[in-house]
Structure formats: structure tokens, C-alpha cells
Amino acid sequence: MTHCCSPGCQPTCCRTTCCRTTCWQPTIVTTCSSTPCCQPSCCVSSCCQPYCHPTCCQNTCCRTTCCQPTCVTSCCQPSCCSTPCYQPICCGSSCCGQTSCGSSCGQSSSCAPVYCRRTCYHPTTVCLPGCLNQSCGSSCCQPCYCPACCVSSCCQHSCC
């Protein structure tokens, strides 16, 4: 595997393009002597941009699809994305005041109907306002396998 540093790199901070498949942008690598590219350790917050890698967990700058309640602030660390969010559940959105994942929304009498709102960067899931889990069920939020952003409104999908 190609290393992140070329001979002309600075000793402690190396700019490279070889992590594009993981980081989506040239990435700053703090350990230039031995760290291979395209590994989680190569990635810093500068890689939080659109077109996120589906197995990476990002902070709010990437509209994460991570299903666990706490995500790291740096990119390309898949440990908090072990479970994809393919169901209309609380996944980091404001669901009846909840910000953690895993519990169904909109079922309690104290909860208003909940939308699964997400920005879709290929390939992930998206449901926009109007896509009530009560009316659409689990088919509301489905993976997007289109080359660009897909949106869904009450189970009617469109891709831009």
C-alpha cells in the first residue's frame, strides 16, 4: 500500500490525495513516516464533506447515518457506525426530545408524529418531512443506491 508521505513531505504534516476513497478529500496525516493511506488514522475533521463514505461516522457536518448516540468528531472512524439507520427511528435527530438512537419515535402519547429527516449523501438513507412512520412504516426510510442525492417523501422516492 502506498504510504501517505512522499519524500518531499514535511516530517509531521503531510498533504496527500491517496485517501480519497476513505476521506473524500486530500487529508492531513500527522504521522508521515509509516501510516498507510486510506485508513481511519489518516483522517481528520477536514474530510467531513458531502459524499460521505457509507461506513464512516461523521459529526453534523456530514449529516451522519450513525446509529449510536455518541460519534467521534473526526471522520473515518467506523466504530460508531456498526448499525446502519434503515428504519424510521431516532438517529441523531430531534425525536420527541431524544438525541440518541435505537428507540422508536412517535409511539408515546407524549410524542407528536416524528419525521425521519436526513440529508442523503450516496449511499445512505433519507426521509423528509411528510414521511410519517405511522403512514409509511419501515419502508419510509430505505437505502439510496443512486449516484447522487436521493430524497423520499412518504415513500415516494426521487433522485437528483
UniProtKB/Swiss-Prot annotation:
Cellular component annotations (GO), alphabetically ordered: cytosol; keratin filament
Repeat region (Sequence), residues: 4-8, 13-17, 18-22, 37-41, 42-46, 47-51, 56-60, 61-65, 66-70, 75-79, 80-84, 90-94, 95-99, 140-144, 149-153, 154-158
Superkingdom, natural source: Eukaryota
Keywords, alphabetical: Keratin, Repeat
Keyword Repeat: yes
Region of interest called 16 X 5 AA repeats of C-C-[GSVRQ]-[QTSPHN]-[TPSGYC], as start-end residue ranges on this chain: 4-158
Keyword NADP (UniProt): no
Pfam families according to UniProt: Keratin_B2_2
Family classification: Belongs to the KRTAP type 9 family.
Subunit structure, interactors included: Interacts with hair keratins.
Annotated function: In the hair cortex, hair keratin intermediate filaments are embedded in an interfilamentous matrix, consisting of hair keratin-associated proteins (KRTAP), which are essential for the formation of a rigid and resistant hair shaft through their extensive disulfide bond cross-linking with abundant cysteine residues of hair keratins. The matrix proteins include the high-sulfur and high-glycine-tyrosine keratins.
Name of the protein: Keratin-associated protein 9-6
Organism: Homo sapiens (Human)
